[in-house]
Amino acid sequence: MQNKGLVICVAVLLTLASIFYLSFSVATSYYDGQAAKIKDPIARQDYKDSVKYLGIYPYQKCLETQIGLGLDLKGGMNVILEISVPDVVDVLADHKTDAAYQKAMKEAKAQEATSQSDFITLFVDNFHKIAPGRKLAEIFATQQLKGKVSTQSSDKEVEKALREEVAASIDNSYNVVRNRIDQFGVVQPNIQKLEGQEGRLMVEMPGIREPERMRKLLQGSANLEFWETYNNQEIAPYLTQLDQRLANGETKAETKDSVTNATNKKQVTEKKTTTKLSLKDDNIGENVGSNAQMAAARKEHPLLSILQLTPGDALSVVGYASVRDTAAVNKIIYSKLAQQVLPSDLRLRWSAKPADGLKQKNIFELHALKVTTSDGRAPLEGDVITDAKDQFDQYGRPEVSMTMNSDGARQWAAITKANLGKAVAIVLDGLVYTAPRINSEITGGSSSISGSFTIEDTKDLANTLKSGRMPAPARIVQEEVVGPTLGAQSIQQGLWSFAIAFVLLMIYMVIMYDVIPGMLANCALLANLFFTLGILASFQSALTMPGIAGIVLTLGTAVDANVLIYERIKEEMRAGKGIKDALQAGYSNAFSAIFDSNFTSLITGIILLVTGTGPIRGFATTWIIGIICSFFTAVYLTRIVFENRLGKDKWLNQKFYTSISKNLMRNMHIKFMSFYKTTFTISAIVAVVFLVSIFFVRGLSKSIDFTGGRNYVITLNKKVHVEDVRKVLNNAFVNTTGENAGKPATTTVIALGTEGNTIRVSTNYNIESNDPAEDDHAETVLYNALKKGGFVSQANVEKFKDPDIREGGSIISSSKVGPSVAKDITHGAIRSVALALIFIFIYILVRFRNLGFSVGSVVALALDTLIVIGFYSVCYGWIGFSLEIDQTFIGAILTVIGYSINDKVVVFDRIRENMKLHPKQDYQTLFNDSINQTLTRTINTSFSTLIVLLSIFILGGDSIRSFAFAMILGVFFGTLSSIFIASPVAYLVLGKKTENRLKNKSEKE
């Protein structure tokens, strides 16, 4: 074998990298176990803050690097937020009453629902049609776009400016969402802009227990404010006094001590505090001393033991605290006693990021803001900002330039004039992003903010300033909430399905190919699994239930490569070759089939990754990684082991069969090409039946992914008949908004699981409404109806919505898909399946250089797809589990295409090989022989894959059962279509071409 050293080097590097990244998961699990033994929550957090894996990586880094669990396994919330592009354009426009503008906006909004073009393109095209002689600059030469659009700007320049503003709005929304989630304390959130879906952000938040709060937080407008501030030395006496009164046991004060009295005590207290908690002290934020010492310090100084006052002139920064102590500080500074002691015009706010120089210790600043208005609001808000950008000053130092409109410029001049030498705090959503010193009065509305900034700091600050002029808040257009109990159940089901599938595969390989080859293939499976998990860990990917299914399915497809190799080795040994020559020929001859089949699977995997979202991407990621790893382990690693062991005498007599498999399907001479008329007729009848069912009779059971609506998975307080629940819910949901106002919403109920007390309710109730309150209202309607029917016994709707409270009935998971998202999912599903077929057609054509193979592949794949969809059409409602068409089903269809093409490529590869070996043999005999020669491999691979899929289907739980069922259908019918459809079609096309070529040749002669 060539390049053996390179293969070994790659294997060693992969092994070391996998061990390194997977070790973070082990370390995190160990630290969590040790921390769980500590009863005191503060001491527990101190322990986590103090530990360092390998003496380098803190606990938080371990947490971020470990393989995380997705929402379906851990529980949590997944939302897609949409920033309305029409709203952004509308804010930027002047002359909004202009008839042409209004009509163009109306037409563009209507067309957006069905067009694949983006809104700006539609708007510009409509404006040109409605007002052909006018320029867009007439509408958009506004103060908002000053410097970008003037009355002389061309339409292309205006369109470019609009696109830049839309992109900026999306970036601003991304930053606001990220900051709000950080503020909420979500561990390992995933926030990303959805490629190809303008204005949409996907947010995954594991472990969320309060979805109502998060909905309000994510959909609120950004609140950017400019505040005047106190100097830290002005506020320190009050904080010292508050600390002393707390130490004396006071919880409420009737009168406020004078500032003079507080000041008199200042020097002594400050001296004690700075001695214990100096900024230069290496122990800030770390676990120092015993629990008893910490308790004594907190008793003596309830506030100043956790909040360090800043010495000297620190402008608005009055103190520092570790992130773990901020909640305790908040409890004190917002207490009734604090209201009595602290100035009434004081507002204390935390910094958005850790203090400079203390980021590793998570030390945050506490700023003192000053109320100067009668209504208690900030004197200046973010809506006055017209632009903000990061740049460099004349000395090459990073700074931020900020421009305001005329009203803002006037107010800004007054604020800066009144606060010379003081700080003005820039606050977004209640957190201070910076508090620069005012050096001079600023007039004209243009300012520069400089300091000890890095380039990243100025970029973040510029984005923060631009966040204040968000034209419209983001709204949730798709949502999924999974309770932690359901997540734990999914983990158990996923692990069981994986373990059973793996054991069955190991046994099957030993039965078919003897102990040593079988166990070597099993070791390759283990290596494949190890490398896959290691690569996932290096990507910091979250493991989902579809992801586990992807790994399990990878085991089935990994067996395919070993089966191909072993079957070729058996053929070579039957031909009289020794073990060494048979091994070399077997690996060499199987390579092209393995490469082509894996590459075509990669095509569908990449399409899934690009077009899918959420769980489908999780499946695609693990599948792609698994395909690559299985190719490496099966083709290269096992060969190295075999070649290294051939020097052993017992290996020279190694067989690749057992008594069971020795003569299995050997010397088969089935004339498959003679059946093509019969198989074509049967296939045509089946296709017609399924097409009639899909389009004219039963249709498809479409999920909310394609129709829009809400899903609720609910545990009830008793076993029920689904029909009884349907009767209760039939008229419960009546639309109150949109075109269907006053009409009952479409509501369906299906049973889940085997216990009889779990159902799923789907409804399109008020789904067209943009009001965030509709989500809570829908849950209230559901609760009232089920409560009235006696199916839940919770005291109130809040307990009904708590997934942790199972007794009495509760919502354990929920999801929502808006109509615009449903439309995009539908288009995306059609596009992804079409792309898969097109790319596979092109690849087969390029690789095999023959149109017949491409046509045969695509015809068979199209039939496979139709049969699976047709089964779902005919069987839904008659089987005891859901057969809905959803995103997961589309993922299954693409996986079926990827798997099915594997089998077809292997058959075609043997046909291609035989065409070279026997160029004069007639095509009918050649095709029949090729199919018979690969029949053992076809049956073995299909059977091993079905073992895996049956394991997922039986043990994987409701969330993945429909996916497994579609795959089982796809594998079964895909195997049949390889033999009875793809090969005969290729035979007919090739035969016709050969017949024409011979005819032309004879005519020339």
What are these regions (language model features)?
Residues 177, 485-505, 557, 577-613, ...:
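Pore- and gate-forming transmembrane helices of large, multi-pass membrane proteins
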Residues 556-600, 643-651, 873, 879-941, ...:
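Cytosolic juxtamembrane regions of multi-pass inner-membrane proteins
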Residues 8, 527, 534-535, 571-592, ...:
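Hydrophobic alpha-helical transmembrane segments of membrane transport and translocation systems
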Residues 12-15, 518-540, 551-558, 619-634, ...:
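Small-residue-enriched core segments of transmembrane alpha-helices in multipass membrane transport
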Residues 2-4, 400-401, 405-420, 424-425, ...:
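Interfacial segments of transmembrane alpha-helices in multi-pass membrane proteins
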Residues 204, 444-448, 456-504, 781, ...:
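Juxtamembrane "pre-transmembrane" interface segments
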Residues 22-28, 49, 65-75, 81-429, ...:
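Non-transmembrane, solvent-exposed regions of membrane trafficking/translocation machinery
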Residues 1-21, 26-63, 67, 87-101, ...:
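Interfacial helix-loop-helix hairpins and adjacent transmembrane helices
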